[in-house]
Amino acid sequence: MSDENPLQPPWLNAPPVDPYPYEESHDLRTGPKLHPALDGLLPYVGVWRGRGRGGYPTIEDFDYGQEIRISHDGRPFLCYESRAWLLDEQSRPIRPAGREMGWWRPVLAGDRATGEWEALMTTPTGVMELHLGKRTGTQLEFATDAVVRTPTAKEVTAGHRLFGIVEGALLYAQEMAAVGHGLTPHLSARLIRVGG
């Protein structure tokens, strides 16, 4: 008869695990090779920083700074991370603002990208959005297919996002349907590459 306790988890006395062994990179000169299905979004990979303007019918307009990091680990998806902070009239930081994490995934036919994309985006405010979209040149356009909210999250029902690389800068515009309003312009920004 074995000395193992069937109620004891198998990992309880296992040796420690080494750090995560796979590299993720926002710099195409280092790290893993970009998956061929991501070639159409190669210009997006990097670290971007800049400023934007936001507003909505239920809030006052505001200026913000933002950093977006788009990275990969060699598999056919991009990791998207955004953090923003409010700016005063002299462009000084006031406080942290929106944060978002997500993944951009090409729709594949075999191993080849079709030009259609899926994006999964989550926020710490309890909203998760599933976007479907298309890439045209260096432009990427997404619209929500579904929005899931925690019971305490703000009522967000739809979104639309347009990203583009214009003269080396990352530009985007975001519309949102929330708290009883239809799709309405919410955010727009211009960011320059600061890494990658």
Swiss-Prot record:
Residues 1-29 are annotated as: Disordered. GO terms for molecular function: heme binding; metal ion binding; peroxynitrite isomerase activity. Pfam families: THAP4_heme-bd. Its EC number is 5.99.-.-. Heme b binds at H186. Pathway: Nitrogen metabolism. It catalyses: peroxynitrite = nitrate. It comes from the Bacteria. Its cofactor is heme b. Forms a 10-stranded antiparallel beta-barrel structure able to accommodate a hydrophobic ligand in its interior. In fact, this fold hosts the heme group, which is located in a wide surface cleft. Heme-binding protein able to scavenge peroxynitrite and to protect free L-tyrosine against peroxynitrite-mediated nitration, by acting as a peroxynitrite isomerase that converts peroxynitrite to nitrate. Therefore, this protein likely plays a role in peroxynitrite sensing and in the detoxification of reactive nitrogen and oxygen species (RNS and ROS, respectively). Is able to bind nitric oxide (NO) in vitro, but may act as a sensor of peroxynitrite levels in vivo. HAMAP family: nitrobindin. Homodimer. This is Peroxynitrite isomerase. It comes from Salinispora arenicola (strain CNS-205).
